[in-house]
Each structure stands twice: as C-alpha cells, then as structure tokens.
C-alpha cells in the first residue's frame, strides 16, 4: 500500500491566480494548471534564492520531493510561455498549518491540517486524541478544541 501524500507547507498565496498571453482570443486559449506548492517551490528557489535543502525544510518535504515539484513547475511555466498558454494557479496538496496529534487508544502519532481535518485517529478511528506538539500556531486552537470537548462531555453526563 503506498504511503499517503504529505502536505506541503506553503507560506505564499498570489493575489492573482490567472495569467494569460496578451492578444490571444479566449476561444483559442488553453491553460496550464500550476499547483500552489509548485509556485511555492519556484518562489523559494528562484526568488528567495534558497538552496534545495533549505527549500525542502521550509516546505517540510524531502529534497527529492522538492526536486520533483520544482521540475514539474518549471516545465509547466516553460510550456505556457513557449506555446502561448494561460497559467492558472490552483489546487495541490498543501497546507499552511499542521498539528501533530497522538491517539490515546493506540498511540499513533500523525499530522493533520487543523483548519480542515477532524480529530479522528486514522489508525483506529478513535476520537481520543491529544495535541502531541505544542506549536505556536496551534496552541490556542488545540486548547480551545479540548475545552469544547470537555464542555460537551460534561453536558452529556
């Protein structure tokens, strides 16, 4: 069974997410879809001028995965520029905020995107999970979530 795809950490979101060649009619327009993490990889490497290892660390992925992402991004941009295609920045497998959780029942430690995911252990399905890493960006959310759960439990008793 293949491993699940890790979320790629992204810090930048463009104001404009659609770029078109000048003077080309819409009916003739084809587009290339550039994923958000592909844009982030190009930004870190080409604008911030970080080395591959630093870029991979910032995105919380391996160097090989970073290289695959940036190769794909550069190819898409080159195709769009040479063939006169529009570039649409959309989709991907990314997050801005991750939280490590630990299942009390089975001991599994896993990461979630706390803005989207639910508090269910992917291993056993238990709802008895706690924050395993008190990171600055999720501390208040985790504490608030725990208080909410405690309140609901006391209400049900």
UniProtKB/Swiss-Prot annotation:
InterPro entries: RNA_pol_sigma_r3/r4-like (IPR013324), UPF0251 (IPR002852). Signal peptide: none annotated. Pfam families: DUF134 (PF02001). It comes from the Bacteria. Belongs to the UPF0251 family. This is UPF0251 protein CLK_0815.
């Amino acid at each position: 069974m293949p491993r699940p795809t890790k979320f790629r950490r992204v810090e930048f979101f463009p104001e404009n997410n659609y770029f078109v060649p000048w003077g080309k009619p819409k009916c003739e327009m084809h587009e290339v879809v550039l994923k958000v993490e592909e844009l982030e990889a190009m930004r870190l490497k080409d604008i911030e001028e970080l080395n591959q290892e630093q870029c991979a660390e910032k995105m919380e992925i391996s160097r090989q995965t970073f290289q695959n992402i940036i190769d794909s991004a550069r190819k898409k941009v080159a195709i769009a520029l040479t063939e006169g295609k529009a570039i649409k920045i959309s989709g991907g497998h990314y997050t801005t905020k991750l939280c490590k959780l630990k299942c009390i029942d089975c001991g599994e430690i896993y990461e979630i995107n706390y803005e989207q995911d639910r508090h269910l252990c992917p291993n056993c399905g238990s709802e008895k999970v706690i924050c395993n890493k008190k990171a600055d960006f999720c501390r208040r959310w985790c504490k608030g979530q725990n208080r909410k759960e405690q309140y609901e439990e006391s209400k049900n008793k």
